[in-house]
Amino acid sequence: TMDAQALQRRKFLNMGVSGVAAFAIGGLLKYQQALAAVPAGAPFFSLNNIGDLLPPDENGIMLPPGFRSRVVARSGEPPIGSPGYTWHSAPDGGACFATDDGGWIYVSNSEIRSNGGGVGALRFAANGDLVDAYSILKNTSINCAGGATPWQTWLSCEEFTVGQVYECDPFGVKPAIVRPALGSFRHEAVAVDTLNDCLYLTEDAPDG
């Protein structure tokens, strides 16, 4: 029943912290080590004073002065002209990850049903050129939102009754890993709390 399912979720959240800790501790330790290596006074940019929004540009997007938009991928088409990989339909949650060469990787969930979902990645050079596109998760369903971890992985969440959370490598080197300790339900998103060494997960369901 619904009450029984809710009770199981509460029991997991209240009593299953050891499983979550086992998943998170390795990444959190790596994050703390990396954070200690960040030099004091590292640049930080606020978005509070970026200016008023201008009229929509050619892509229909309103941006402040100095910003521009461009289309980098279209569903059903190869992002960089290579026939080897086609950008997915139904894009949803995503995040960006810095690369060592000054560029970045954008990852995007696909909310297709019936094992047609997954996660795609676009890699950009430091000058903004798109240099690679590839899949980092395949054969999953209704990948809605998720969350970036401080140790440079992407948690992709399935949004259906027995949905799972998959930890994905944005660089496409390591295979994605399902994380059963994060529960089986209609997942929405994940947030990593590095101060308290825990994860917060939201559920996309009428009863929350």
Model-derived features with residue positions:
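C-terminal segment of N-terminal export signals and the immediately downstream linker at the start
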Residues: 6, 26-65, 69
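Beta-strand-rich domains and repeat architectures in extracellular enzymes and scaffolds
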Residues: 62-64, 70-110
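Well-ordered mid-protein domain cores that form the structural environment of catalytic cofactors
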Residues: 107-176
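N-terminal secretory signal peptides
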Residues: 1-11
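Beta-rich, blade/repeat-based domains predominating
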Residues: 85-97, 139-151, 184-198
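Sec-dependent signal peptide hydrophobic core
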Residues: 16-20, 24
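Blade-edge beta-strand/turn elements of extracellular beta-propeller
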Residues: 57-75, 82-85, 124-137, 168-186
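Internal, well-ordered domain-core segments that constitute the primary functional module
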Residues: 152-208
